């Protein structure tokens, strides 16, 4: 069994998974959304204090598994350094106390493994990762083989939703509130499609965001129409760039992972792409789209099999990570 810890942002989560069967034996998550919503975004110091409070409470519920643990896994990159620290400190303590190896998991790779909870890996696969501050197209061919096809030049998909929600005076996180408001509106606000005439495969959301700001300031449009127009254009930009990547790399399998993969409009548009290009489309179960320790445990199972262990003295917190570019 592996015990995993996730504390990279504003979700505190622990999981226990069987190594051979990949069966999820325990999974619990405490979200901090309510506490941060009053500030319109995540406050790192507050998040850190809330993790420090929640982690021991959840750990208490996992004690029955301690005698059978073969390793402890923890998200150590990327994320907020003060929140990553909370999870890493607990993982180190468990590694020493139980005399078991430590596995440091890249949170973004963890999101890919959210597809495979209680399932076998599917590879090779092209992956659209839309999680928090990240919007990337990746090529996945196993735990040791993830490379980057494209990334964002400025804001991520998720950040742009949060910022537009803030401009409209809506709550945090922006994804669900924009998605719900958009259902009541019409796509009538003219917004630019970024990088339309650029040959590269990349993302950019600053232009759409600025156009939304000008539309709000003009006073001509209802909030629901702005939300609908923004969401449609933001998703169109994703599909436009993914289409370029799909034409170039011709994947048999294509997955969408990360918090924004819960967006139903986004799923709908990629279903259309799947039918057009003939690839198999995958996304995680809804409960595993946002940050969770189950996906960290699932990635750690593959790392355990390959002996990818760290000494408790050597584990480092890495707030930012870059993948190698695909050749």
From Swiss-Prot:
GO terms for molecular function: iron ion binding; N(6)-L-threonylcarbamoyladenine synthase activity. It comes from the Bacteria. Its EC number is 2.3.1.234. Binds 1 Fe(2+) ion per subunit. InterPro entries: ATPase_NBD, Gcp-like_dom, KAE1/TsaD, Peptidase_M22_CS, TsaD. SUPFAM superfamilies: Actin-like ATPase domain. Keywords: Acyltransferase, Cytoplasm, Iron, Metal-binding, Transferase, tRNA processing. It catalyses: L-threonylcarbamoyladenylate + adenosine(37) in tRNA = N(6)-L-threonylcarbamoyladenosine(37) in tRNA + AMP + H(+). It holds the Pfam family TsaD. The keyword Cell division does not apply. It is found in: Cytoplasm. Its cofactor is Fe(2+). Fe cation binds at residues 107, 111, 291. PROSITE patterns: GLYCOPROTEASE (PS01016). The keyword tRNA processing applies. GO terms for biological process: tRNA threonylcarbamoyladenosine modification. Gene3D superfamilies: 3.30.420.40. One of its GO terms (cellular component) is cytoplasm. Substrate binds at residues 129-133, 162, 175, 263. Required for the formation of a threonylcarbamoyl group on adenosine at position 37 (t(6)A37) in tRNAs that read codons beginning with adenine. Is involved in the transfer of the threonylcarbamoyl moiety of threonylcarbamoyl-AMP (TC-AMP) to the N6 group of A37, together with TsaE and TsaB. TsaD likely plays a direct catalytic role in this reaction. HAMAP family: TsaD. Belongs to the KAE1 / TsaD family. This is tRNA N6-adenosine threonylcarbamoyltransferase. It comes from Nautilia profundicola (strain ATCC BAA-1463 / DSM 18972 / AmH). The gene is tsaD.
């Amino acid at each position: 069994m592996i015990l995993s810890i996730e504390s990279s942002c504003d979700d505190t989560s622990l999981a226990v998974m069987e190594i051979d069967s990949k069966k999820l034996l325990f999974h619990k998550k405490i979200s901090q959304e309510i506490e941060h919503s009053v500030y319109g975004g995540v406050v790192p110091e507050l998040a850190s204090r809330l993790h420090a409070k929640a982690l021991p409470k959840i750990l208490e519920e996992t004690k029955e598994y301690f005698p059978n643990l073969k390793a402890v896994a923890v998200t150590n990159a990327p994320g907020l350094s003060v929140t990553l620290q909370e999870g890493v400190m607990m993982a180190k303590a468990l590694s020493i106390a139980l005399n078991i190896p430590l596995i440091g998991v890249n949170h973004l790779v963890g999101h890919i493994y959210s597809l495979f909870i209680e399932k076998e890996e599917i590879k090779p696969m092209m992956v659209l990762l839309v999680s928090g501050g990240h919007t990337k197209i990746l090529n996945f061919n196993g735990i040791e083989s993830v490379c980057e096809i494209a990334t964002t030049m400025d804001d991520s998909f998720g950040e742009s939703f949060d910022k537009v929600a803030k401009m409209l005076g809506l709550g945090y996180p922006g994804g669900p509130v924009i998605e719900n408001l958009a259902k009541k509106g019409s796509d009538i606000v003219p917004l630019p499609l970024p990088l339309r005439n650029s040959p590269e495969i990349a993302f950019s959301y600053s232009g759409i965001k600025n156009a939304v700001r000008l539309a709000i300031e003009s006073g001509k449009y209802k909030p629901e129409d702005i939300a609908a127009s923004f969401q449609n254009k933001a998703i169109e930009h994703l599909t436009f760039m993914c289409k370029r990547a799909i034409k170039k790399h011709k994947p048999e399998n294509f997955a969408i992972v990360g918090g924004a993969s819960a967006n139903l409009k986004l799923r709908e548009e990629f279903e259309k792409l799947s039918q057009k290009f003939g690839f198999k489309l995958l996304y995680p179960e809804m409960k595993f789209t946002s940050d969770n320790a189950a996906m960290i445990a699932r990635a750690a199972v593959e790392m355990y099999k390959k002996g990818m262990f760290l000494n408790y003295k050597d584990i480092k917190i890495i707030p930012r990570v870059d993948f190698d570019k695909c050749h």
